[in-house]
UniProtKB/Swiss-Prot annotation:
Protein name as it appears in the record: Aspartyl/glutamyl-tRNA(Asn/Gln) amidotransferase subunit B
UniProt GO MF annotations: asparaginyl-tRNA synthase (glutamine-hydrolyzing) activity; ATP binding; glutaminyl-tRNA synthase (glutamine-hydrolyzing) activity
The protein's role, per its UniProt record: Allows the formation of correctly charged Asn-tRNA(Asn) or Gln-tRNA(Gln) through the transamidation of misacylated Asp-tRNA(Asn) or Glu-tRNA(Gln) in organisms which lack either or both of asparaginyl-tRNA or glutaminyl-tRNA synthetases. The reaction takes place in the presence of glutamine and ATP through an activated phospho-Asp-tRNA(Asn) or phospho-Glu-tRNA(Gln).
Database matches in Gene3D superfamilies: 1.10.10.410, GatB domain, N-terminal subdomain
Any Gene Ontology biological process: translation
Subunit structure: Heterotrimer of A, B and C subunits.
InterPro entries the record matches: Asn/Gln-tRNA_amidoTrfase_suB/E, Asn/Gln-tRNA_Trfase_suB/E_cat, Asn/Gln_amidotransferase, Asn/Gln_tRNA_amidoTrase-B-like, GatB, GatB_C_1, GatB_Yqey_C_2, Gln-tRNA_amidoTrfase_suB_CS
Catalytic activity annotation: L-glutamyl-tRNA(Gln) + L-glutamine + ATP + H2O = L-glutaminyl-tRNA(Gln) + L-glutamate + ADP + phosphate + H(+); L-aspartyl-tRNA(Asn) + L-glutamine + ATP + H2O = L-asparaginyl-tRNA(Asn) + L-glutamate + ADP + phosphate + 2 H(+)
UniProt gene name: gatB
Family indicated by similarity: Belongs to the GatB/GatE family. GatB subfamily.
Organism: Gluconobacter oxydans (strain 621H) (Gluconobacter suboxydans)
Organism phylogeny: Bacteria, Pseudomonadati, Pseudomonadota, Alphaproteobacteria, Acetobacterales
Keywords per UniProt: ATP-binding, Ligase, Nucleotide-binding, Protein biosynthesis
Enzyme class: ligase
Enzyme Commission code: 6.3.5.-
Amino acid sequence: MSYRITGSTGEWEIVVGLEVHAQVVSEAKLFSGASAEYGGEPNTHVSLVDAGFPGMLPVLNRECVAQAVRTGLGLEAEINLFSRFDRKNYFYADLPTGYQISQFAHPIIGKGKVLVDLADGSTREIGVTRLHLEQDAGKSIHDQDPTRSFIDLNRAGVALMEIVSEPDIRSPEEAGAYLRKLRQILRYIGTCDGNMEEGSMRADVNVSVRKPGETEYRTRCEIKNVNSIRFVMMAIEVEAQRQIEVWEAGGTVDQETRLFDHVRGETRSLRSKEDAHDYRYFPDPDLLPLVIEQSWVDELKAALPELPEAKRARLEQEYGVSRYESSVLCVEQAIADFYETVARGADARLAANWMLGDFFAALNRTGRSIEDSPVSAEGLRELLGLISDSTINGKIAKEVLEDMVETGDSASAIVERKGLRQVTDTGAIESAIREILAANSDKVEEYKGGKDKLFGFFVGQTMKAMKGKGNPALVNETLKKLLSE
């Protein structure tokens, strides 16, 4: 179902394109040997190139180029064997050179696509226009002194990939799904950590509105540097609503750059939107055009890990998990790997149910992730094996899992220590049931008189008497036999 916003003149459609700035995972910066590591004391990860000292020449980091190519391959995009670096000229205090080295006319990556899953079960393809490499700027700090601002150049010169989508997004939900999928791909490939809270992935959001059926785009506004998926979705809604109100009041929307204030739930004008000529782009005279070999691209492609969509399809085929289950299991590569280790030696469906249910719930309660789980994949597999061979039942297994999370002990050790082995002795089960039936003779008569729901009562009382250790199937079977006497 199409997303629409209703105004005083009827329904409106939103049109969104996203420019995602993803920090490249590399040890050094794009054109210098300074560390690209996040954090550190201010101005400790700075070379003379980053600081814009006269006479310092940029030297391209080969690994950053490789990371851009890997990302392009992950986006099923065109890899341009010829690309070029340009100077984007503008003045800002945290840009020491007075220009940013970027790629304007000839980006390293061309058209690609991202496949996103939506809440209604449908799938949409969002086009990628281009990906280019560029330098990040430094950081201006305004809250340390009432009269002065400070500059930290640790981030200056760090390699960024700017990934530009086509204006294919038609709802806040689609924008969120696109960003989540893009981040997932980058993390799988290892080209960006996707930590939006650290600024290593942020989005500029281009929003316009139009009447359903219109084919031309109306004037768009760009919302700069939105640093969470939730805020991107909120910003789209409030900016679209603002533009609709402007159009319906008989006004026109100005092309401008805006900021999103999540506290007030509004966007505010920052400056008029710049065009390319405002930046006076020209080829960087200190850098040769970038020419890469197809054979190198092929090598990088052959070494890529299995990508999310391929992994999902394989899990569904090999292990019989549902589309929803595969989407959750493949959110992170570590989760998918954990699941496969469990499923290889256990009932694959049981493994999926337990991971998505009790196991994730236990991790969430203790504030842990899959990487620092106190229960290993082998440990969870052992627990599921105890269920499958009827050593313990599902209810007891939940108790054992809680103990495993708290103590780190193995499932079998906990079962032995606590005496939790399931009772499969039919004589012991029959004895327990006879005691329950004798103590509840009135309910036995009611059951035999047609009150079938009491069967669950007898099962519950039996399991309680056996401290949850009775084999459920044997309890049910024996109970039916005794009640029919």
